[in-house]
Each structure stands twice: as C-alpha cells, then as structure tokens.
C-alpha cells in the first residue's frame, strides 16, 4: 500500500479538481441545471479512486480502481465540453481539457503496470 500523495497523477488530479470546482461555480444553474454539481462530483472521483486503488491489497484491485478513475476522467471531459457549449462565458477550458487528457494517459500507463503485475502474480 502506498501513499497516493507520492503519485504525480494523484497530485495533478487533485490540482485539476480544485481548478474545475472553480470553473463549476461559473456555470449558471438556469443554463445547465445540475451540470455544475455533476462536474464537481465527477472530478473529485478521479483522485478519490486513485487513492482508493493504491490502498487495495492486490494489483488487480488497484487496476480496477484506476479503470474507474479513467472512466471518471471521460465523464469530466464530457461535462466540461457540455458546459463550454452551454456557457460560452467559461471560455474554451483548453488547458483543463489538455490536463484531463494527459492525466488519462498517465492513468492508462499506471493501470497497465498493475495489470501486468497482477498477471505475473497469477502465473506460476
């Protein structure tokens, strides 16, 4: 079990969560009811699932939680793209979208590492 704060992907996803919470405050409720809350919940789920994963006792379970973090990453991207379309005052959010994509690549790589580790534990 490792400390998630030692992982760059966790630290960067925490930073992104803080940034997107600020962005979410700029989404007017009348333009997109519930979208702000959905965005906040989904972005918080990324570092939460990374942390939950690294706390698991087996590489296979770590990989499972990283897969959930990847799915949350896609969800955040979708909510953010929708918010940009519905609320032009938010701007393009290009930096946040780029960071989401970079984090996703990091998560895929980390998940692959744990999947391989899980397979090697099962192979006699």
Regions found by a protein language model. Give the residues of each.
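Short, C-terminally biased terminal segments at protein or domain edges
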Residues: 1-124
């Amino acid at each position: 079990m490792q400390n998630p704060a030692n992982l760059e992907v966790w630290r960067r996803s925490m930073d992104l969560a803080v940034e997107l919470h600020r962005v979410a405050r700029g989404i007017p409720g009348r333009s997109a009811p519930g979208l702000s809350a959905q965005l906040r919940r989904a972005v918080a789920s990324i570092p939460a699932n990374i942390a939950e994963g690294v706390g698991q006792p087996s590489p296979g379970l770590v990989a499972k939680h990283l897969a959930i973090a990847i799915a949350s990453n896609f969800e955040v991207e979708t909510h953010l793209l929708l918010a940009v379309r519905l609320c032009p005052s938010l701007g393009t959010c290009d930096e946040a979208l780029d960071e989401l994509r970079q984090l996703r690549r990091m998560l895929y790589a980390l998940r692959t590492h744990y999947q391989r580790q899980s397979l090697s534990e099962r192979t006699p």
